A protein has these predicted regions:
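N-terminal Rossmann-like NAD(P) cofactor-binding module of classical short-chain dehydrogenase/reductase
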Residues: 132-134
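Predominantly a Rossmann-like dinucleotide-binding segment in NAD(P)-dependent oxidoreductases
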Residues: 179-184, 189-293
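Bacterial N-terminal signal peptides that target proteins for export
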Residues: 1-8
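C-terminal motif of bacterial Sec signal peptides marking the signal peptidase cleavage site
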Residues: 18-20
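Short acidic-hydrophobic, aromatic-tinged amphipathic segments that line or gate anion-handling sites
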Residues: 112-119
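Beta-strand-loop-alpha-helix segment that lines the small-molecule cofactor/substrate pocket
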Residues: 138-139, 143-191, 205
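NAD(P)-dinucleotide binding in Rossmann-like oxidoreductases
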Residues: 290-292, 296, 306-332
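N-terminal Rossmann-like dinucleotide-binding module
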Residues: 22-106
Length: 332
């Protein structure tokens, strides 16, 4: 036994020496924290957190974007009392016609059609008999359309994400404050039964003092990639890095942690894996090797708030996993 122990000890020593020789630490990587300052607020503007707009007896709605999500939204709105769909817009005339069929099948009047031009949406925003513009286009047009609609006297509802840069976020905020028009990001997960039940439990004190919340968007989009107009969503992931669809997890987490109602997000650290499935999918479809695919398969972001709470947000649309938002609440 003593001999075996001695041999084992020698082996461990040799392994340790070999590892120390072959796995010498590399020069430390330099990380420069990115500090984001709140820009100077325009004089005289008030926030819109508690904005109440004058009552509208019948809300007249125009839809921009009738591809992946738009037709479903049109269909749902045919069931909402006190609303009227008055305008439909898409670059493709065929898509507009398909949504007109939805109205016809619901026994509703045909809406004004806009299509055939990349600027056709502006004509919809300028149409006088519209109260609300519903935007369901590709992401890069969301903020521009929202700002233009509010500047033309319309309330705005935008599918997530409502904006892609900090500059765009502040454009939406400033325009909403200036025009006193609602600008709502249509984050549906904050209204799902599980998230609302959990929020109610948290507000009733079931979890005690909530310290940590987790959420995610885990959704393998392999079956959906071909349906996106001009391949815009895969293209965005190829050219951009990070959690590009954060609010499914972050929205419910912010509600529970009372973000902007006594607390605020202050610091984040985010990491991603290497890109594997994105480049593999493109090669499978086109036969071409992808030399530079920016977004990793999995992105994990840890956020700390001013009051010392944390949230963990994950994003993964590439790997073959079951759909999950991985919602969890940790209290003390």
């Amino acid at each position: 036994m003593k001999k075996l122990f001695t041999v084992t000890a020698i082996g461990l020593a040799l392994l340790t020496w070999h590892t120390s020789c072959t796995l010498q630490p590399k020069a430390p990587e330099a990380f420069t924290p990115i500090k984001v300052e709140t820009p100077a607020r325009p004089a005289g503007q008030e926030d819109v957190i508690q904005l109440v707009a004058p009552k509208i007896d019948t809300v007249r709605v125009g839809f921009i974007g009738l591809g992946m999500r738009g037709p479903g939204a049109v269909s749902r709105w045919t069931h909402i009392p006190g609303t009227k769909i008055v305008a439909l817009c898409d670059l493709s005339p065929e898509r507009v016609e398909k949504s007109q069929e939805i109205l016809k099948n619901a026994g509703m009047l045909e809406a004004t059609s806009y299509s055939g031009s990349e600027d056709a949406w502006k004509k919809l925003c300028e149409q006088e008999d519209i109260d609300l513009v519903y935007i369901a286009t590709d992401w890069k047009h969301h903020a521009e359309m929202g700002v233009y609609a509010m500047e033309h006297g319309k309330h705005v509802a935008i599918e997530v994400p409502a904006a892609m840069t900090l500059d765009e976020i502040w454009q939406l905020i400033n325009t909403s404050e200036k025009t006193r028009k609602h600008c709502m990001q249509l984050e549906n997960c904050v209204y799902d039964f599980f998230e609302l039940t959990s929020l109610n439990m948290a507000q009733q004190g079931v979890f005690g003092d909530v310290l940590h919340v987790e959420g995610s968007y885990i959704h393998n989009l392999e079956d959906f990639w071909p349906s996106y107009w001009n391949n815009w969503r895969m293209d965005y992931n190829q050219k951009h890095r990070g959690d590009v669809y954060a609010t499914h997890g972050m929205g419910p987490a912010c509600q529970v942690l009372n973000i902007h109602r006594g607390d605020r997000m202050k610091t984040l650290v985010s990491m991603d894996t290497k890109a594997v499935n994105g480049p593999a999918y493109i090669k499978k479809q086109t036969g071409e090797e992808v030399k530079d695919f920016q977004n990793g398969d999995q992105t994990s972001t840890l956020i700390r708030t001013e009051n010392g709470k944390t949230m963990l947000i994950q994003h993964n649309v590439m790997t073959p996993r079951p759909y999950s938002r991985m919602y969890q609440i940790v209290g003390a």
